[in-house]
Amino acid sequence: MQSITVALDAMGGDFGPRVTVPAAVQALSHFPELKVILTGDQQQITSQLSLLGYKPDARLSVQHCDRMISNSEKPSLALRNSQGSSMRHAIELVADSTADACVSGGNTGALMALSRFILKLLPGIDRPALISALPTVTGGRSWMLDLGANVSCDADTLFQFAVMGSALAEEHLNRAPRVAVLNVGEEETKGNDLVKRCAELLSQTQAVHFVGYIEGNQILKNAADVIVCDGFVGNVCLKASEGTAQLFIEKIKTSMMASSIKGWIARILFSELFNELKTLNPDQYNGASLLGLRGIVIKSHGSADVSALVNAIGEAVHEVKRQVPSRISDRLEAVLLERHY
């Protein structure tokens, strides 16, 4: 079995080593081929390992870094002052092939800026994009991009996002994904010039299976496998859907935990529904991929708990196995040839 090495920014996220270290240890038991390099404050990391009764070994190592990038740092400042940081070092381990992928729950803007600076973009890509899986009512999942890396885009950039998203989704689905552009209506006359031009470009290529427009109320209805939009729209949609799912889960959970007769009735009536709603829990889909780079970088939610971070590490393992950057590069090459002829 070929090993897969993930560089984990141990200082990233809201809870730092208190979550990243247990997640790394748990991930090792989930994925027998996995090795983890924890980057960050060695004293804090080893302290957490001691609490777990775990010592660094052949599968888990620690590389000390003097500083971390805070969530409040602007990307430009983080880029200038990133030397010696846990996030930068994790990305550099991918760049020099010590690690196969990087996972971080740290500052999104800084992660994107550093990844782009260190790993560079694939040929034919203007900007990287954040993509993540979303649950659907049918029990499957779809993928949406961009989720906040680029708040404004032109049509060519959205077209590139569609090509990259299709390549990633295909590695999960093992079939040609249905690609749609998020719009205010399904009719061809609806929408602004940006989405209309993007749809025009997608309808002219054989590189993706374009199915037209979808509206916001169809995002979770399995109407498409890949949903394309700019980062502003995507981030708002993502946060709204996550908040709605968490609201329903917490409301039913609160009712079921009540000690009164009302709680007893709720446990009888809603136990099956609660189990169904848990499949919509955003933690199960934690791990947004930063596509368009010459390496694999996974962004975890800053607020992720241990199990959610394990899911992000799992996404990194999957993308390494499926050689996602190479798949995207091949798809882009086909598009460039298609446009040339």
Swiss-Prot record:
Main location: cytoplasm
Location within or outside the cell: Cytoplasm
Involved pathway(s): Lipid metabolism; phospholipid metabolism
Catalytic activity reported: a fatty acyl-[ACP] + phosphate = an acyl phosphate + holo-[ACP]
Gene Ontology biological process terms from the UniProt entry: fatty acid biosynthetic process; phospholipid biosynthetic process
Cellular component per GO, a single term: cytoplasm
SUPFAM superfamilies: Isocitrate/Isopropylmalate dehydrogenase-like
InterPro entries linked: FA_synthesis, Phospholipid_synth_PlsX-like
Cystines in this chain: none
EC main group: transferase
EC identifiers of the protein: 2.3.1.274
Gene3D superfamilies, per database record: Isopropylmalate Dehydrogenase
Alphabetized GO MF terms: phosphate:acyl-[acyl carrier protein] acyltransferase activity
TM ranges: none
Lineage top rank: taxon: Bacteria
Keywords: Cytoplasm, Lipid biosynthesis, Lipid metabolism, Phospholipid biosynthesis, Phospholipid metabolism, Transferase
One Pfam family cited in the UniProt record for this chain: FA_synthesis
Similarity section: Belongs to the PlsX family.
HAMAP family noted in UniProt: PlsX (MF_00019)
NCBIfam families noted in UniProt: plsX
Quaternary assembly: Homodimer. Probably interacts with PlsY.
Free-text function comment from the UniProt entry: Catalyzes the reversible formation of acyl-phosphate (acyl-PO(4)) from acyl-[acyl-carrier-protein] (acyl-ACP). This enzyme utilizes acyl-ACP as fatty acyl donor, but not acyl-CoA.
This protein's name: Phosphate acyltransferase
Gene name per UniProt: plsX
